[in-house]
């Protein structure tokens, strides 16, 4: 078989278990010689066999590249059940595994991302917004994986990319319509993060990840609720024993958990701090995205899906603040009609029964009530949750994701209401430019 070694073609005749066997075979050939095994070589074989077709070795300096040829303008290569445009490189880091890299035009790459991050059947404007976000992310992230020989990975660690398998005429059209366009802030490529759904409000990046990003500012989302969102609301239940195990196995220094509650909300109503208490009286407070990630457990198959949730079964005071503002505590004024013909001057001290049947006492704060005209919220500040003697904590929330940047279901809802992709991007990202 033919081999391309260090810039020249050679012919190889066989593989041997030892150098002496190779040297004996070489003596039977005019000009033959034995070559040691290389840890940077790449061998091409017939699929499913050991029959060698070609070998390549450039000491790891240049990888093997394969450019497919075929009929039509866009030859397609199959790899592990997926179809890809463009060429492939097969670098091998010295002593390491072989990498498979798809070398593809930027627009073809975006066409391979869109239908895996958003349904290819969604409204065109939503797909166009997603295309601009995906393109911006790729351009901004290029070369951050360069030590491995590629620009971006193909998983959720970067953006899901699986070639052309899931592409639709509409998703491809969205990419073509926005070709070359990216999101900029102050002349620089923006970090166009996105999530599935915000549950009613996005959030400041500072309140989720700790660093303020001027164009990643939270806001109430009046559009998302109009979309039909699967599993928009979620409920997850933990026992004290489960929470203790989850926290301790995640490396947190805490004893047997006896209480957990939201200790601070952001002004937009998303969770900013959660406090855990143990049987020794010690407390642990986490903030930002850790508020939901602290509950994550593959062992129990449980997680908190968004930054927008409440906890029942614990007891504690919650303030409204966040990283971008000081805590505030206010109470509602006036009187409240109860039981038809009675009034209360204050809700402090009022007895209530929770949705789970637990009896408790209010000490003021943000309270949802059912009136003749619907559900309303009164007060804003100190909230005391009802203690659950059974030791079970119930987390109820809306949305799915980190709540920062564009809501994908919100983009869908805006598109369905007639907004274009620029409207969508300008709503979810503050003071940006699209060009």
Identify the function of each model-found stretch.
Residues 1-435:
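Conserved, single-site charged/polar hotspot
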């Amino acid at each position: 078989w033919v081999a391309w070694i260090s810039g020249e073609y050679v012919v190889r005749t066989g593989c041997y278990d030892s150098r002496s066997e190779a040297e004996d075979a070489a003596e039977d050939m005019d000009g033959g010689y034995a070559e040691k095994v290389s840890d940077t070589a790449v061998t091409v074989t017939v699929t499913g066999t050991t029959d060698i077709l070609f070998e390549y070795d450039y000491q790891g300096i240049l990888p093997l590249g394969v450019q497919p040829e075929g009929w039509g303008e866009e030859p397609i290569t199959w790899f592990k059940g997926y179809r890809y445009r463009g060429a492939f490189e097969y670098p091998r880091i010295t002593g390491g595994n072989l990498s498979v890299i798809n070398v593809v035009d930027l627009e073809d790459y975006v066409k391979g991302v869109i239908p895996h991050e958003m349904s290819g059947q969604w409204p065109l404007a939503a797909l166009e917004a997603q295309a601009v976000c995906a393109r911006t992310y790729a351009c901004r992230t290029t070369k951050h994986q360069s030590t491995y020989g590629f620009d971006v990975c193909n998983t959720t660690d970067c953006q899901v990319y699986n070639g052309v398998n899931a592409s639709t005429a509409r998703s491809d059209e969205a990419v073509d319509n926005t070709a070359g366009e990216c999101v900029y802030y102050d002349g620089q490529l923006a970090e166009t993060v996105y999530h599935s759904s915000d549950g009613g409000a996005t959030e400041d990046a500072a309140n989720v990840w700790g660093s303020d990003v001027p164009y990643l500012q939270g806001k109430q989302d009046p559009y998302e609720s109009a979309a039909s969102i699967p599993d928009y609301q979620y409920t997850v239940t933990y026992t004290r024993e489960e929470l203790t195990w989850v926290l301790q196995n995640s490396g947190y220094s805490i004893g047997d958990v006896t209480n957990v509650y939201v200790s601070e909300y952001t002004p937009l109503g998303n969770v900013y701090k959660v406090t855990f208490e143990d049987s020794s009286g010690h407390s642990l407070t986490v903030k930002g995205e850790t508020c939901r990630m602290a509950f994550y457990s593959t062992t129990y198959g449980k997680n908190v899906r968004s930054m927008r949730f409440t906890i029942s079964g614990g007891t504690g005071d919650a303030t409204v603040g966040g990283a971008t503002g000081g805590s505030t505590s206010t109470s509602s004024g006036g009187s409240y009609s109860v039981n038809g013909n009675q009034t209360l001057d204050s809700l402090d001290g009022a007895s209530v029964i929770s949705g789970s049947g637990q009896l408790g006492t209010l000490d003021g704060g943000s309270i949802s009530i059912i009136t003749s005209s619907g559900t309303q919220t009164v007060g804003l500040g100190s909230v005391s949750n009802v203690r659950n003697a059974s030791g079970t904590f119930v987390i109820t929330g809306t949305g799915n994701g980190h709540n920062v940047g564009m809501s994908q279901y919100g983009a869908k809802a805006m598109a369905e209401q007639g907004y274009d992709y620029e409207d969508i991007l300008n709503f979810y990202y503050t003071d940006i430019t699209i060009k």
